[in-house]
Amino acid sequence: GPMGIMGPRAGEDGHPGKPGRPGERGVVGPQGARGFPGTPGIPGFKGHNGIDGIKGQPGAPGVKGEPGAPGENGTPGQAGARGRVGGTGPAGARGSDGSVGPVGPAGPIGSAGPPGFPGAPGPKGEIGPVGNPGPSGPAGPRGEMGIPGVTGPIGPPGNPGANGISGAKGAAGIPGVAGAPGIPGPRGIPGPVGAAGATGARGIVGEPGPAGSKGESGNKGEPGSAGPQGPPGPSGEEGKRGPNGEPGSAGPVGPPGIRAGVMGPPGSRGSSGPAGVRGPSGDSGRPGEPGIMGPRGIPGSPGNVGPAGKEGPVGIPGIDGRPGPVGPAGARGEPGNIGFPGPKGPTGDPGKIGEKGHVGIAGPRGAPGPDGNNGAQGPPGPQGIQGGKGEQGPAGPPGFQGIPGPSGTAGEVGKPGERGIHGDFGIPGPAGPRGERGIPGQSGAAGPTGPIGSRGPSGPPGPDGNKGEPGVVGAPGTAGPSGPSGIPGERGAAGIPGGKGEKGETGIRGDTGNTGRDGARGAPGAIGAPGPAGATGDRGEAGPAGIAGPAGPRGEVGPAGPNGFAGPAGAAGQPGAKGERGPKGENGPVGPTGPIGSAGPAGPNGPPGPAGSRGDGGPPGVTGFPGAAGRTGPPGPSGITGPPGPPGAAGKEGIRGPRGDQGPVGRTGETGASGPPGFTGEKGPSGEPGTAGPPGSPGPQGIIGAPGIIGIPGSRGIPGVAGAVGEPGPIGIAGPSGARGPPGGVGSPGVNGAPGEAGRDGNPGSDGPPGRDGIPGHKGERGYPGNAGPVGTAGAPGPQGSVGPAGKHGNRGEPGPAGSVGPVGPVGPRGPNGPIGPRGDKGEPGDKGPRGIPGIKGHNGIQGIPGIAGQHGDQGSPGTVGPAGPRGPAGPSGPAGKDGRSGHPGAVGPAGVRVS
């Protein structure tokens, strides 16, 4: 049935998406309420400037504002570097076979199509043996350590704005349905072969898909009637043989290939590709005149046997077109484009062998019937057991080539019969003469990798290969034990300072942490220089004036009464006008030193200081004597084969070495066993029959004599000079066919004639199913461990270890002796909070301080390790089969082929009775 809709292609990872523009900053929340100022104390005598008061408790943090709306998607940035190619995902499940659609009418004959695409490169040859690694070069001297640069001052951090909440990532859209494949156009003229591309990394073999349903077998067609046999034609002249060429010199040995990684599990057998369109047959040349046989050339030495190429995939048989006349042989075209692989059907059960019918009398050839629809291809039957080949008898004498007989009407194409059980394979006979190379068919799609064969014996070491490019840096291994420290080299000059790195992207701001406890108050710092006077702020509005009462006379001052209880705090009055600042009072006497307050809680750890300069290396230790080599332990078990590593990049092509001497001629290898025969191809179209000549008159029948005794065949004489070919005599009228007589007894086999000329090679049949995997060879015995190598040189000093954890705090020391009376001591412990006083006026804003020095831009962070490629999605269902393309123009008719060699002579019938 037609193929289902083709699913999305699996394989490479797409380009990474472009990063979106960061969202807008969220709205900053309102500022928290300001705490109430304390109650003003009773103004006392102005003494010395007191110690600065303790800072009041900070107000509660304001409520975080609502996050701003997510910003619009920004302009896409530049595309990032392309990610590594992902591994091939598992093969998707095979979709169900679609229903068989109706066959459309044949389209009109289209014009010649445009030139086709360049053909795919041929299969890659097998990888040659890997050469022995060359000796390691001596380790270079260690470079001098540069002087560390001076750490720049850290600028004041800016106020980072609150980042808005990132918008939610949209859901991935549903992948669109792949469109149906277009109508295939006519096959164009093959284009030139393109340059072979670099071989890609080998993908992981996917799991085999489920087997498809079994197709129905077609009905067996009726045998067609045979046409009349034409008279023999004249024989052509034999062409002269050319001299043998001198043997060519052997080519240079190619560089060894890159060693492949560990192969994955065996994959399923690939599906068959479509069969290529058969090209027109070539025109037979005129027979040449027989020339004088030249001297026999010096036999060339057999060349080295090259590696066997990989077997190509089997293509899906295409739809048979109507047979056209055979055209002249065209120039060999370039290989066509690779077709899409079709689904592989399951191996069906062998069909039942039908009963052999009786051979009827051959009737006249009927008129050609219409081409029937091609039935569904049945599943291939199981491979039969290979049997022994029978003995090949001597070839019979070549028959005379008759004049083509009259063309009979083409009979109706019969339906293909059921495939019978494959017979035994015979012993392979001697190879026949090589036929002309057929026109290459359209290349089928490359099937999945076949199963891994057993490992063959190791070949001789090849020449040292070119040094490849460094491979992908692997994950850092565990640090080994530190080697002995080398002698420190002289300190080199300071390196050129690196370029300023790009500013990293601002990260998402974290949530505000809880407010920590106040640490112990530090010693008062030195009084800084007064800043520039700020601009005078606007004066506040004056409050409403109270009603002025009448001024009474001032009374005498009475004695002071006892202090009463403190009354409740009155309502806050309106702020009065700001008074002028009084003159600075004189410093009072220094008070006695107060007792030392208890130690406050430990404050948080400060930021880490800049890294100190690296100290000078210690003197090198004395190298100890190498210890005696220990006894070689027993070989450990083989480890599990790890997963295949990523293939390294192809190395640069090295300088071509001088041509080596030609090695001795190797012995000819034994002839391998014959492979299984391919499937029997469908019956080809019948050629156009020639016009019949006039039949000749039958001659008188003589007396049939008894067969003589077969004599001993004489030695082959020297061939005489070929005489001129006589003109054929007139052909008599054919007499009426007589009644069929009873079959005679089986006579003794006649003498086999000389072998006839080999006919032209037929079209290559489709590749047969792969043979069964051979029995894997036994693993060779493990060799004895080699002798221990010499002691290696000391390695370079390892990297500096990380800073260890901080040690525990020591016990507190005993208090020392009391010192002399010093200046004013530190502030004592904080007293209880006083009652909340009225809210004071808002102070005037001070001048904006100078902007701090911008900080040095930090280095870019270490780039993260790329993530693991995600799995590929399931393979979609197969797409529908497109309609058949237009039919191409018919080619010119070719010359008639030569008749095959004649069969064995039949048995001699009984002697006839002469009628007087």
From Swiss-Prot:
Protein name per Swiss-Prot or TrEMBL: Collagen alpha-2(I) chain
Chain segments carrying region Disordered: 1-167, 183-711, 732-916
Entry keyword set: Calcium, Collagen, Extracellular matrix, Hydroxylation, Repeat, Secreted
Lineage, highest ranks first: Eukaryota, Metazoa, Chordata, Craniata, Vertebrata
GO BP terms in the entry: extracellular matrix organization
Family stated for the protein in its record: Belongs to the fibrillar collagen family.
Quaternary structure and interacting proteins, as annotated: Trimers of one alpha 2(I) and two alpha 1(I) chains. Interacts (via C-terminus) with TMEM131 (via PapD-L domain); the interaction is direct and is involved in assembly and TRAPPIII ER-to-Golgi transport complex-dependent secretion of collagen.
Task performed by this protein: Type I collagen is a member of group I collagen (fibrillar forming collagen).
Keyword Transferase on entry: no
Biased composition (Basic and acidic residues): 10-24, 839-850
